[in-house]
Amino acid sequence: IGPRPGDSYPADPVWCAHLGARVPLLEVLCAGARPLIFVDTLCQDSASAQPMIDEFRRCAVAAGISPDAVTGSTEDNVVTTQTGIGVTIIGVIPDGDLPKALDGDIVVCVGAPISAPDDDVTPDRPEIVTLDEVRALMASGKVHDCVPVGSHGVAWEAEQLSSTAGLRIESQHTDVNLTRSGGPSTCLVLACASGNVEELCGLVAPERPWAVIGHLSSVV
């Protein structure tokens, strides 16, 4: 995926870099961790990779990482014809405990699942939750647990969130496609107290999809 001769799916290199960065960044942020170091590995020469490296720095800053803590490597020894991106994020959980949902929590899908090639995944799509929004949600102290949605879909991630807490999810009717791939984590699933749903909704853009998909209860 990218603009190079050997790529099978054409895409803007800067947007490729953004999507390549956002997935691991969201995993770290949603785990309640503070990302500290951003490491990229690119399978092309440094000159052609520079726009992607610049985007990595922008993503790092959006996630709370200093631009000086962005490092990585390019391939300048041999000629390559395809885009290849690797990203590693190192972070720390301040209190050492992973977040966990609570009995009675409301489960919300923030954003909506979209994925190429079925969808045109472009920067202006309102379905895509932003790094800034995820930071604000997690910094609120009112999100009990949160998981990015990948190729398994919303329902699968919601089940992972509930089972990790030893709970079960009671689903409710929603227009959200619960089985569709979330591609590059265009949306996320979070758990919070019912009284905090409205306040948390105010931390994301008004056009961002926000849907209650169920609630959590004890396993009988």
Kindly label every feature range from the protein language model.
Residues 1-52, 57-114:
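Glycine-rich phosphate/pyrophosphate-binding loop regions near the starts of catalytic domains
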Residues 55-66, 80-81, 139-144, 149-220:
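Glycine-/charge-enriched secondary-structure boundary and capping motifs
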Residues 73-74, 132, 175-177:
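A generic local structural motif
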Residues 84-89, 97-140, 144-162:
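Conserved mixed alpha/beta catalytic, RNA-binding, or beta-rich assembly cores of soluble enzyme
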